[in-house]
């Protein structure tokens, strides 16, 4: 693993067992990602993309293989240590924003900091800063139910970045948005990558979206291809 390596997974496999029936969702996946890199993994639904993100984020355990983050094998960490790592080092963005509906945009964005025991005033100041970065400073006291779909996703991005994570794992982050809003969101991710040096690993079935990132790999039937064949991708 190089000095600039942020994330490495080696011979990663994931098998789900249901009685006598077994399903191999990930099969011998290996790749390395550098600090500050923006990388896309393209694949159709059911190809194993989301499972891979869950394993990389320590939300699921591989059947075999290893995930190494900043030189630390995840297999050596307790559940509490993984949770702490996720809160300090990782950000998550999903197709559906998963905002708390009864909380304001400011409260949603501040939540990871409060979980990390950051003082409330400091957490709110940082949350305001991130909402300003995504162009929503004026909407900070609106509940998520009062925001448009694009605004909610921008709040989710601000929440993912409020802890200044080294890596953001994004699962179809624009899949629920119209093309114009999706374009705006991806311009924002690029700006934050440059401004904060945040690395982004984005899984998507949208080839046009993936083409905006530094590197593209393809997931097909649980295996990672080092070159795109475009099978199952949407152009």
From Swiss-Prot:
<dbReference type="GO" id="GO:0022857">
    <property type="term" value="F:transmembrane transporter activity"/>
</dbReference>
<dbReference type="InterPro" id="IPR003439">
    <property type="entry name" value="ABC_transporter-like_ATP-bd"/>
</dbReference>
<keyword id="KW-0067">ATP-binding</keyword>
<dbReference type="InterPro" id="IPR017911">
    <property type="entry name" value="MacB-like_ATP-bd"/>
</dbReference>
<comment type="subunit">
    <text>The complex is composed of two ATP-binding proteins (LolD) and two transmembrane proteins (LolC and LolE).</text>
</comment>
<keyword id="KW-1278">Translocase</keyword>
<feature type="binding site">
    <location>
        <begin position="43"/>
        <end position="50"/>
    </location>
    <ligand>
        <name>ATP</name>
    </ligand>
</feature>
<dbReference type="InterPro" id="IPR015854">
    <property type="entry name" value="ABC_transpr_LolD-like"/>
</dbReference>
<keyword id="KW-1003">Cell membrane</keyword>
<keyword id="KW-0813">Transport</keyword>
<dbReference type="InterPro" id="IPR003593">
    <property type="entry name" value="AAA+_ATPase"/>
</dbReference>
<dbReference type="GO" id="GO:0005886">
    <property type="term" value="C:plasma membrane"/>
</dbReference>
<dbReference type="InterPro" id="IPR017871">
    <property type="entry name" value="ABC_transporter-like_CS"/>
</dbReference>
<feature type="domain" description="ABC transporter">
    <location>
        <begin position="7"/>
        <end position="234"/>
    </location>
</feature>
<protein>
    <recommendedName>
        <fullName>Lipoprotein-releasing system ATP-binding protein LolD</fullName>
        <ecNumber>7.6.2.-</ecNumber>
    </recommendedName>
</protein>
<dbReference type="InterPro" id="IPR011924">
    <property type="entry name" value="LolD_lipo_ATP-bd"/>
</dbReference>
<comment type="function">
    <text>Part of the ABC transporter complex LolCDE involved in the translocation of mature outer membrane-directed lipoproteins, from the inner membrane to the periplasmic chaperone, LolA. Responsible for the formation of the LolA-lipoprotein complex in an ATP-dependent manner.</text>
</comment>
<dbReference type="GO" id="GO:0016887">
    <property type="term" value="F:ATP hydrolysis activity"/>
</dbReference>
<keyword id="KW-0547">Nucleotide-binding</keyword>
<comment type="similarity">
    <text>Belongs to the ABC transporter superfamily. Lipoprotein translocase (TC 3.A.1.125) family.</text>
</comment>
<keyword id="KW-0472">Membrane</keyword>
<keyword id="KW-0997">Cell inner membrane</keyword>
<dbReference type="GO" id="GO:0005524">
    <property type="term" value="F:ATP binding"/>
</dbReference>
<dbReference type="GO" id="GO:0044874">
    <property type="term" value="P:lipoprotein localization to outer membrane"/>
</dbReference>
<dbReference type="Pfam" id="PF00005">
    <property type="entry name" value="ABC_tran"/>
</dbReference>
<dbReference type="GO" id="GO:0089705">
    <property type="term" value="P:protein localization to outer membrane"/>
</dbReference>
<dbReference type="InterPro" id="IPR027417">
    <property type="entry name" value="P-loop_NTPase"/>
</dbReference>
